[in-house]
């Protein structure tokens, strides 16, 4: 169902002449893997979105940092990064000790939310618009708001993804155009 909705979005944007990259991410055995399902130059690459599958954990902050690096090769001046999220960053591998924090810590809860929000702020500081479609538990609403602020839309069912993301994209394009 996620792949179908992602396909609809990617196909619609490409049909409007908007360059589209579709990427998924997960963390497996200590590695955060970004998988490009459809890249900007892929002619009719939207079908590759059907290769999406959910797996592993999600270290959102690191994935966003990687997405920011990938955006540097994008063909447009202005960029919009839209995520489908449950606003519950979580990883099986701990955060390593640093000078400020001498003990390792779990990557979950408030620590994961803070890390993800920091990466969203960093992307926005680079001029990248970041928005999210949130599909998660009521308990995760405060985390979603803390991470994405006003650039957030909530859905309750996956079949609402394409329409909701479409409205979010329209809002973001209006902002980018002004």
Task: Specify the residue positions occupied by each region the protein language model found.
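Acidic, glycine-rich A-domain
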Residues: 1-178
